[in-house]
């Protein structure tokens, strides 16, 4: 399983000039965060805790820094409990609008993003349409 995940996701980011967006869904304590961190570490050997984001503003700020330094290709990012920062109820907020614009063009950056949420409904509909993988934790 590890080899398949690494080969498929790493290949998308580093060989096929694509992005990767996934979501891990499940109740509190189901292992979403741990699993997302392990996947990110497996795919991207340079992954560190500094690439775990908890709100859109942090993610947007960090993305701008990576883009300016030309350091986006192949990077994995975990947006933990994404529903708190980018849920459907905040669709009209300034950060939400900015984040949706970033998600529209993120494919050009060849990055991997893993969201964790309690329910898929907690993730904005625009983000859901861009997902490449869905995993439900029980």
Regions found by a protein language model. Name each.
Residues 38, 42:
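Active-site signature of alpha/beta-hydrolase-fold catalytic machinery across serine-
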Residues 32:
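Conserved lysine of the Walker
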């Amino acid at each position: 399983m590890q080899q398949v995940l690494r080969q498929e996701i790493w290949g998308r980011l580093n060989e096929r000039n694509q992005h990767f967006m996934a979501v891990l869904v499940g109740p509190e304590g189901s292992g979403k965060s741990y699993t997302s961190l392990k996947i990110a570490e497996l795919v991207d050997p340079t992954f560190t805790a500094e690439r775990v984001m908890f709100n859109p503003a942090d993610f947007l700020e960090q993305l701008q820094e990576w883009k300016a330094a030309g350091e986006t290709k192949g990077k994995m990012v975990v947006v933990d409990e994404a529903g708190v920062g980018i849920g459907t109820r905040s669709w009209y907020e300034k950060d939400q609008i900015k984040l949706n614009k970033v998600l529209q063009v993120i494919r050009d950056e060849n990055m991997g993003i893993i969201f964790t949420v309690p329910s898929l409904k907690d993730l904005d509909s625009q983000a859901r349409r861009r997902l490449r993988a869905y995993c439900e934790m029980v």
